[in-house]
Amino acid sequence: MKRIFILLLALVLSVQVITATKNQEEFNLNYDQQKEIVHFVENQIIESYSNYYTIPTINVEIESVNVRDNQLIIDLKANITKVLKVNSALELPYVKGMLEEISNIRDKYDFDRAKRYAENLIKDLNYNYIGVEQNENADFQMQIPIIAERSNLYNTRCNLLFKDENNDTLTMEEFAPLSEEMLEKDGKRYINNIIEHQKYSIRSSSPGNYDRIIARDYVRKWSDACGECHCSDCDPSKLVYNPSYANYHNNDCANFVSQAIHEAGVPTDDKWRPGNRCWYNTGHEGDGLIDYMVEEGLFFETNDRYKAFAGSIIKWTEASHVGMVDQNDTVTMTFCAHTDDRNSCAFRTIRGLTFFVPVWDSYSKQWTPQ
């Protein structure tokens, strides 16, 4: 059925596009075509998530339609509500892998440490994710070749791609979460990492003040979805920004994350406060938010996405940009940010990304294994 839909769509649209471009007319999809494309994309997203999530609601909108490189390029935005299918965190593949690895630990001290970490993660997952609707926004692109002759129809290949946040485009197979086997392996690997490399960074009295769940809720409230006003050049008056803080418009990412951290309990000082460089600068080239948080012993750096629970900072290593993780259920992750504005935005690859995780987990009331 999917193949038949693609062939018919490619044929119909190709004839229309060729005619429109020859006449130098703007090409528009009619209502029925838009409806079919949206329905197709929605089904592909639901199928990609079917192993782990039910999808109570999904809304896909066509953002733009262009002819480029002999293809019809359709950019789409999706808002997805997803709920984990499992009834307990114990049923998640990542947790299963952790518990299996813990059962093999013979040293009592190591066993107790690993077990304590697993119990706290399970508590977090059961309360914040199991049975809870998670909102997610994602960008997609459909590429339909323009076919000049009907004889070439069966050689055509229409692509639906996920537009990742580090400027990658991924196939729907790559967009889909990892297999259960891979997630179990990652759970085992993480327990080994805790046992072999665990250390704590306790250099400040402030880590215990940071409530990462409050920070999570703050960034969700004061960021816009991947919609009308998600870009840096839109009307600032339409953006969802907290009026209690200054708005740096086209360079507001660090200012936004600083707000969340402060609202979540970390006190300001002479160096890190609104208006100072450490507050509104990322630290990509030194002397910024990231530098301050690490030097003060509040956050530590890791490239392990499983450590980056909600309330962690996400940083782009090749750009001066930061955001905050707002969801990590061990299957998928989302983040919120300003400039460009993102709200519970999906991402898959972590190439070019690093995470800064609170050294104190306010939710489980324990120091975070590094």
PLM regions and their residue ranges:
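Positively charged n-region of N-terminal signal peptides that target proteins for export
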Residues: M1-I4
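Sec-dependent signal peptide cleavage junction
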Residues: S14-N28
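A short hydrophobic beta-strand element
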Residues: N70-K82
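Short, cysteine-centered beta-strand-loop-beta hairpins and adjacent loop/turn segments enriched
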Residues: I80-G97, I130
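Non-catalytic propeptide/linker segments at domain boundaries
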Residues: K108-I214
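N-terminal capping segments
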Residues: N192-C278
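...with weaker cross-activation on analogous glycine-rich loops/strands in unrelated enzymes
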Residues: N276-R342
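Low-complexity, Gly/Ser/Thr/Pro-rich intrinsically disordered linker/tail segments
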Residues: T334, R348-Q370
